[in-house]
UniProtKB/Swiss-Prot annotation:
Function: One of the primary rRNA binding proteins, it binds directly to 16S rRNA where it nucleates assembly of the body of the 30S subunit. With S5 and S12 plays an important role in translational accuracy.
Subunit structure and binding partners: Part of the 30S ribosomal subunit. Contacts protein S5. The interaction surface between S4 and S5 is involved in control of translational fidelity.
Gene Ontology molecular function terms on file: rRNA binding; structural constituent of ribosome
Transmembrane spans: none
Name of the protein: Small ribosomal subunit protein uS4
Domain of life of the native organism: Bacteria
Keywords attached to this entry: Ribonucleoprotein, Ribosomal protein, RNA-binding, rRNA-binding
Organism from which the protein derives: Streptococcus equi subsp. zooepidemicus (strain MGCS10565)
Family according to the record: Belongs to the universal ribosomal protein uS4 family.
C-alpha cells in the first residue's frame, strides 16, 4: 500500500484524528467525508477497531504500509519495555518526525519534504532519508543555504511550544532529541495495544 498523498483534511475526518496537529480539519465537521458523513459512524468489529487504530497511527506519521509494518517487526526484536511503546519510540526517532517536533516544519509531511530536498543536516552532514533513526544528542540543523527558506522560517515562527524531550536554538536553527519521550508525551489519542493486536494476527 503506497503512502497517502491526497488532502490531509479528508483523511483526518475519515480517521477522526487531526493529521496536521492543528485540529482545524475537525473543528467544523468531525465526521467522515461524503454525502452521509454525519450518519456514517457504524459500529466497528474487533478487527475493524484494530485496523482503524493502526491506520490512525500510520497516517499520523505519513508512512506507507510496508515501511510501517517493517518498523513494527523491528520493534518486536527489542528485548526491554512493551512492544507497543517501543514501536512508537521508533516512530518518534524518525528524522522527519524529529524535524517536526523541533518546529522546523508545521507538519510531518512538510518535514519529510524538507528532508527529501536536502535542507536538513545531522551532526553537520546532509541526510535526505526521512526514515533515518535519530540518536539522543545528535544535532539536527538546517543547511546554511536553506536557512532563509521562507517555509522553514515561517514554521519556526509559528511554533508556540516544543515537547520537553527536545531542545532547540531558534537563532542557529538547530536542536536535538535530549531524551526518549514518555508515553504520555506522545499521541495520547492512540491505543497502541490495538495496533499490536492487529499485527500479531497479520504476522
Amino acid at each position: 500500500m503506497s503512502r497517502y498523498t491526497g488532502p490531509s483534511w479528508k483523511q483526518s475526518r475519515r480517521l477522526g484524528l487531526s493529521l496536521t496537529g492543528t485540529g482545524k480539519e475537525l473543528a467544523r465537521r468531525n465526521y467522515v467525508p461524503g454525502q452521509h458523513g454525519p450518519n456514517n459512524r457504524s459500529k466497528l468489529s474487533e478487527y475493524g477497531l484494530q485496523l482503524a487504530e493502526k491506520q490512525k497511527l500510520r497516517f499520523s506519521y505519513g508512512m506507507g504500509e510496508k515501511q510501517f509494518r517493517n518498523l513494527f517487526v523491528q520493534a518486536t526484536k527489542i528485548k526491554e519495555g512493551t512492544l507497543g511503546f517501543n514501536f512508537m519510540l521508533l516512530l518518534e526517532r524518525r528524522l522527519d518526525n524529529v524535524v517536526y517536533r523541533l518546529g522546523l516544519a508545521t507538519t510531518r509531511r512538510q518535514a519529510r519534504q524538507f528532508v527529501n530536498h536536502g535542507h536538513i543536516l545531522v551532526d553537520g552532514k546532509r541526510v535526505d532519508i526521512p526514515s533515518f533513526r535519530v540518536e539522543i544528542g545528535q544535532v539536527i540543523s538546517v543547511r546554511e543555504k536553506s536557512m532563509k527558506v521562507p517555509a522553514i522560517l515561517e514554521a519556526v515562527e509559528a511554533t508556540l511550544g516544543r515537547p520537553a524531550f527536545v531542545s532547540f536554538d531558534a537563532e542557529k536553527l538547530e536542536g536535538s532529541l535530549t531524551r526518549l519521550p514518555e508515553r504520555d508525551e506522545i499521541n495520547p489519542e492512540i491505543n497502541e495495544a490495538l495496533v499490536v493486536e492487529f499485527y500479531n494476527k497479520m504476522l
